[in-house]
């Protein structure tokens, strides 16, 4: 049995340690990571992929995949505790550490201001941004259908991030700072990482690698000697 109240209290404590001041600028960033987490075997195994891209070319230079035994059942609002062990396992394998991480999930756009992007960013002390495909909390005004349409995401008077339509005829992305990135800069960094798809390149690659999608399989056939590892800790 898990102590939900204790985990929520830990979230509030860790959220108080989050910095929303920019720890990077456009000149200092050389490598950007994308991170994605999924589950296998009916949730018994957690799988995390981290892709490292060179900036600003957005060329893939390294990837790591880790699979670990899932330590926590799904509990709404506590997903980061379920996901971060696999992320840390993949992180430990990296040869090239990034200057910025885009995480598939929430940053501070979370009821207790600690989504997986914030939690992971705090643990590794690297600037992070949450790039989520759906809203967890907050409100926003109606969003135009045009590409590039954007609205701020608010919870009462607090701006948590942005709702941004990155591609026509696609649902918007919910972008929020994770750690050591400001609300204002979070959207700009995601926009710099786009290449015509709904998702920014770092998380698009992480998703493709984690799920072994055809995009990644084709790329592997062309780059058979590329640096990449899969680590199982089960």
UniProtKB/Swiss-Prot annotation:
This protein's GO CC annotations: cytoplasm
Coiled-coil ranges per the record? none
InterPro entries in UniProt: Endonuclease-V
The positions annotated as site (Interaction with target DNA) read 74
The highest taxon in the source lineage is: Bacteria
Q: What class of enzyme is it?
A: hydrolase
Residues the record lists as binding Mg(2+)? 36, 104
Q: Which gene encodes it?
A: nfi
Would you kindly state one Gene Ontology biological process term found in this protein's UniProt entry? DNA repair
Alphabetically sorted, this entry's keywords are:
Cytoplasm, DNA damage, DNA repair, Endonuclease, Hydrolase, Magnesium, Metal-binding, Nuclease
Q: Which family does it belong to?
A: Belongs to the endonuclease V family.
One Pfam entry for this protein is Endonuclease_5
User: So which cofactors does this thing need?
Assistant: Mg(2+)
Q: Which GO molecular function annotations are given, in alphabetical order?
A: deoxyribonuclease V activity; magnesium ion binding; RNA endonuclease activity, producing 5'-phosphomonoesters; single-stranded RNA binding
This protein is called what? Answer: Endonuclease V
Where does the protein end up?
Cytoplasm
Annotated catalysed reactions = Endonucleolytic cleavage at apurinic or apyrimidinic sites to products with a 5'-phosphate
Q: What is the organism of origin for this protein?
A: Yersinia pestis
């Amino acid at each position: 049995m898990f102590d939900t109240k204790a985990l929520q209290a830990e979230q509030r404590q860790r959220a108080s340690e989050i910095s929303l001041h920019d720890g990077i600028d456009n000149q200092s960033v050389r490598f950007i990571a994308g991170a994605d987490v999924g589950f296998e075997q009916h949730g018994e195994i957690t799988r995390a992929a981290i892709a490292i891209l060179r900036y600003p070319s957005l060329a893939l230079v390294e990837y790591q995949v880790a699979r670990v035994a899932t330590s926590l059942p799904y509990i709404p609002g506590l997903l980061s505790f379920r996901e971060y062990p696999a992320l840390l396992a993949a992180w430990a394998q990296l040869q090239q550490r990034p200057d910025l991480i885009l995480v598939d999930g929430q940053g501070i756009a979370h009821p207790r201001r600690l989504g997986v992007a914030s939690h992971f960013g705090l643990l590794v002390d690297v600037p992070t941004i949450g790039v989520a495909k759906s809203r967890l909390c907050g409100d926003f005004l109606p969003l135009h259908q045009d590409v590039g349409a954007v609205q701020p995401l608010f919870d009462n008077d607090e701006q948590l991030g942005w709702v941004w339509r990155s591609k026509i005829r696609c649902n918007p992305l919910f972008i929020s700072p994770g750690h050591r990135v400001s609300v204002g800069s979070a959207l700009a960094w995601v926009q710099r990482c786009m290449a015509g798809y709904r998702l920014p390149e770092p998380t698009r690659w992480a998703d493709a690698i984690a799920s072994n999608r055809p995009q990644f399989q084709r790329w592997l056939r062309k780059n058979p000697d590329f640096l990449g590892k899969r680590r199982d800790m089960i």
